[in-house]
Amino acid sequence: MRLIVVSNRLPVTISPSGEIRESVGGLATAMKSFLGAVNGGRELGLEEVVWVGWSGVPSERESNDLRERLRGMGLEPVPLSSEEVEGFYEGFSNSTLWPLFHGFSEYATYEEKHWRAYRGVNEKYAKAVVALARPGDLVWIHDYHLMLAPAIVREAAEVGVGFFLHIPFPPAELLQLLPSEWRREILEGLLGSDLVGFHTYEYSANFSRSVVRFLGYKVEMGAIAVGHRRVRVGVFPIGIDFDRFYNSSQDPSVVEEMAKLREMLGRAKVVFSIDRLDYTKGVLRRVAAWERFLREHPEWRGRAVFVLVVVPSRTGVPMYEEMKRQIDREVGRINGELGELNWVPIVYLYRFIPSPTLMALYNIADVALITPLRDGMNLVAKEFVASKRDCRGVLILSELAGASKELAEALVINPNDVGGTAEAIAEALSMSEDEQCRRIRAMQERLRMRDVVRWGTDFIYSLISAKSAREEVEKALRYMEELSVDKLKSDFAKAKRRLLLLDYDGTLVPHYPYPHMAVPDGDLLELLSRLAALPETAVYVVSGRGRDFLDGWLGRLPVGLVAEHGFFLKHPGGEWKSLGKVDPSWRQYAKGIMEDFASNVPGSFVEVKEAGIAWHYRNADETIAEKAVVELIDALSNALAGSGLSILRGKKVVEVRPAGYTKGTAAKMLLDELSPDFVFVAGDDETDEGMFEVAPQSAYTVKVGPGPTLAKFRVGDYRGLRSLLEQLRPP
C-alpha cells in the first residue's frame, strides 16, 4: 500500500536556472515533519509516498528534463499552462473560494470561465492520480483547490480517498452564494472521499449541514450516507513539530539571530506578528489596536515596540497592492506621530524572513499578536507558544482562528474590537511571570500531545479504517447478489429460532396518497398469519404508523407490532407498552412550523401522532416539495436545537419525534431479547436503515425499491417482497 499525496503545488521551489529546492512552510513542512517521524510512512504500513502537484513552472516552460528530475524525487508533476493557472488558481480558487470560505463574500467573483478552468484542472489532477494508482493505495488530497478531484478518482480507481481542508468551511448560508450547479459539484466532489477532514468541529458541522441542506443526504454518527457508502467526516487539528520549536533557542544559528535582534531592539518589550499579505489577516485593525494601546497607555511609549512582519503575497493583484499601500501609510503615520528619535512604535518588515530569524523572533518576543479576521488554524500561534522554553511570553489570539479552539489559555480577543485588543496588549505586557508560565505550560502540554505527527497518523489510520469499512460493504453487496432464493429457504428451514422484522408502507403494501388508504388486503393478512403461526417464528411489523392504525388492522394477527418508529411496542398477544415518555411541550411549536410549510406546498399535509408529528408530501409537486424539505429540516433543526428531539426523513415524509427511539433501537431490543439464529429484515426508506445497521452479519436484509441502502439484497417493490415471503410460508 502506497500513499499518494495530492496538492496544488509540489513541495519544491524551482529557481529560474532549474535548481530544485525544498519548499519552506505550509503543507510541505508539515508533511516533511510527519513523514520523517514515521520513517517515510513505513511505520504506518506505507511502502512508498508519491506526491502529485504542479511544479510552479508553466507547462510551456517546463522541460522534460525537469519533469524527469522531479519524478526521480518521488514527485509527479501535473502540467499547467499559464492560462490554466490564471483561471484555476488566481481565478476560481483565490477569487471565488478563498474569500467566500473565509467569510469575505463581498470580495468573491463568480466567473463562468474560472469555474470551467477549475473543473478542467481538477480533472487533470485526478487523471494523474489514476495513472499512478495501484489497487489498495491511499490517496490524500489537500485543500480547496482540488475539491472536485475525490469523486473523479473514486470513479476510476480502486483506492482509499481522503480529503483534508486547510481553510474554514463556510456556513451553508455563505456556500449558497455559489451557483447551485457549482455548489452541488463541489459537495459531491468532496463526498467522493472515504474520509473528509477539517481542523475544527465548527468547520465539520458547517460541511455536514450544507450536505443535508443542498443534497438531502442523511448525516448520522459522524458519517454521511451516499449510496451504499458511508463517508466519514472527522476533525484533525493540524499540529507542529513541537520539539523543533521548543529546542530552537539551543540552535546556534537561532542564538546568533537572537543576539542581533536584542542589540537592535534594546531593552524594550517586544510585541510581534507575522502574516502573509491578505485581507483575512486583519493587519490594519491590528495596527489600529497598537496605536490605540499607545495613546491610552502612554507610559509604554519607548518601553515597547511592535515588530510587524508582512510577507509579500499575490504581488501585482490590485487589491493586494492597495492593501500594502494602506499598511505602509498607517505605519508611517503612527511612527511619525508617536515616535521619538531613539524609538519607533512599529518596526515594519515587508519581506520573507528566513527560518532562523523567525525562530529568533519567537524566542525574544514578549507578546505574539495573532489577530486574523478568519483563519483555518494559524500555526504561528502554536509555533510561538512551543518556542517558549523559558516559559515566558503571552499569546493574544483571535477567536476567529481555528487555533483558538485548542489554545484556550491565550488572551482570546475579537479582532474587530480594536479597544478590546488594545486592552489585551496592556494586560499581556503587565502579566506576572508566574501567570505567563502557567498559561504557556498548559498550552505547550497540549501542543506536545497534538503535534503534526499525531495529525498525520490519526488521519491515515482513520482513512485506512474508512476504506476497509467501505470495502466490507462492497464485498457483502457483491456476495448477496449471488445468493439464490433456494439458500434463503434452506437457511429459514434449518433455523431453530426465527425473527422477521417487516416495515409496512411501501414494503408490505404500496404507498398511497393518504395514510388512511393503505389498509392491508386479505392476501397480506393471510401471509402474515401463516408465517407467524410457524413454530419458533416471530413476525413483527415495524412501522412509523400509530398504534390505533396497526391495532385496528393487524391487532388480531399473531404478530408483534412496533408503532411510531420504535416508540411503542406490542408483543404477539400482549399489550402495548411505551418505550419512552411523551413530552407535549414542543408539539405545538413544531406543528406550527410544519403547518406553515404545508400551506406553502400544495398537496402536503401534517399528521399528528401520539409521540411525533409528521409532514407528508407524497401528493405534492416533487420539485417544490424537495426544495421545501431541505428548508423545513433546517428550520426544525434550528428551532428545536437542544430539545432532545430527532428529525427523521423518510420516503416523502419528515417527522419530528423524541430522540433515541428508532426502528433500529426497537430492532436491537428484539434481537437481544429473542436471540434468533435466522433474521430477515425488510424496509423501503431511510427510517429502515437503522434496522439494517443493527442486524447481524448473517441476516437477510432486503431493501424494497431504489435508493441508497445498507441492505445486502434488493427487490423491486412490495410485490417482490411478498413473493419472497411466500417462498417461506408453508403451503
Curated annotation (Swiss-Prot):
Pathway: Glycan biosynthesis; trehalose biosynthesis. It catalyses: D-glucose 6-phosphate + UDP-alpha-D-glucose = alpha,alpha-trehalose 6-phosphate + UDP + H(+); alpha,alpha-trehalose 6-phosphate + H2O = alpha,alpha-trehalose + phosphate. Residues 1-464 are annotated as: Alpha,alpha-trehalose-phosphate synthase. Keywords: Carbohydrate metabolism, Glycosyltransferase, Hydrolase, Magnesium, Metal-binding, Multifunctional enzyme, Transferase. Active at 80 degrees Celsius. UDP-alpha-D-glucose binds at G25, G26, R276, K281, L379, V380, A381, K382, E383. D-glucose 6-phosphate binds at R9, Y89, D143, R314. Its EC number is 2.4.1.15, 3.1.3.12. The gene is tpsp. Residues 465-731 are annotated as: Trehalose-6-phosphate phosphatase. May interact with the putative glycosyltransferase (GT) TTX_1305. TTX_1305 is required for the trehalose-6-phosphate synthase activity of tpsp. This is Bifunctional trehalose-6-phosphate synthase/phosphatase. Its cofactor is Mg(2+). It comes from Thermoproteus tenax (strain ATCC 35583 / DSM 2078 / JCM 9277 / NBRC 100435 / Kra 1). Bifunctional enzyme which catalyzes the transfer of glucose from UDP-alpha-D-glucose to glucose-6-phosphate to form trehalose-6-phosphate (Tre6P) and removes the phosphate from Tre6P to produce free trehalose. Disulfide bonds: none annotated. InterPro entries: Glyco_trans_20, HAD-like_sf, HAD-SF_hydro_IIB, HAD_sf, Trehalose_OtsA, Trehalose_PPase. CDD domains: GT20_TPS, HAD_TPP. Part of an operon with putative glycosyltransferase TTX_1305 and putative membrane protein TTX_1304.1. Alpha,alpha-trehalose 6-phosphate binds at D503, Y504, D505. One of its GO terms (biological process) is trehalose biosynthetic process.
